[in-house]
Amino acid sequence: MIIAANLKTNLTREKTAKYIKEVESFLNQHNISQEVFVFPAISNLISSSANVVVGAQNAYPTQNGAFTGEIGNEQLEEFGIKTILIGHSERRHVIGETQDSLIVKFNFYKNLGFKIIYCVGEPLHIREMGHEKMMEYISAQYVGIDAAYENLIIAYEPVWAIGTGLTPTLEDIKMIHKELKAKSTAPLLYGGSVKVTNVEEVLALDGVDGVLVGSAALYVEHFCTMCEYAQNIDKKNKKL
């Protein structure tokens, strides 16, 4: 299973380094073999540890150049970073990234062989228009994206659930993941108010290959517990 922490614009460089060290220690002590990713704020980028892959929340599709306020692959190379989040709802709806710009970014980092966690999901007003309209909206986010890319991970994140404490029902998550699984064989994560009190149920659902965790991941002990839950569920599934 895949457990990913999006730390967003939180923590300092010192606190991020401590966070990753604590996660690494926990994974070692508990023999956890799941894929674990941490996406720190840009100023806090550091190299991956043995069991924690550090990725970029965002980067401009360039090696370097005159792109004020951005970072490019040259800056990521310094830390050996080869993993990136693309299409997160906050990049789409707060920063204003368009599907066309995301396609350019996706293709640039795909051509460099990056592992890409590509995010899709619907805002509340689209969800309220009904299931068919919701799936049309989500399907449009696949346009121009190579869904067969071998280093692709997809994260479904209902925009209305992010940071609100609201979550779809387990049955809703299961149903949507089933439909999205038909679009790509890539691992499919769930994101959207994932927390330590609901993650075990979410991870146990058919079609859920892991979780992308936001604010709840800021509590390192909670994130570590989520990693342990994933390990236990993975072991249980392998016995079936």
Curated annotation (Swiss-Prot):
Pfam families: TIM
Lineage of source species: Bacteria, Pseudomonadati, Campylobacterota, Epsilonproteobacteria, Campylobacterales
Residues annotated as catalytic: H88 (electrophile), E157 (proton acceptor)
Positions contributing to substrate binding: N6, L7, K8, G163, S193
PANTHER family: TRIOSEPHOSPHATE ISOMERASE (PTHR21139:SF42)
SUPFAM superfamilies: Triosephosphate isomerase (TIM)
UniProt keyword Isomerase present: yes
GO BP term (any one): glycerol catabolic process
EC numbers: 5.3.1.1
Enzyme class per UniProt: isomerase
Record's subcellular location: Cytoplasm
Full protein name: Triosephosphate isomerase
GO-annotated cellular components: cytosol
Subcellular location, principal: cytoplasm
Function: Involved in the gluconeogenesis. Catalyzes stereospecifically the conversion of dihydroxyacetone phosphate (DHAP) to D-glyceraldehyde-3-phosphate (G3P).
The reaction(s) this protein catalyses: D-glyceraldehyde 3-phosphate = dihydroxyacetone phosphate
Record's subunit section: Homodimer.
Ranges annotated as spanning the membrane: none
GO terms, molecular function: triose-phosphate isomerase activity
Protein origin, superkingdom: Bacteria
Keyword check for Hydrolase: no
Alphabetical UniProt keywords: Cytoplasm, Gluconeogenesis, Glycolysis, Isomerase
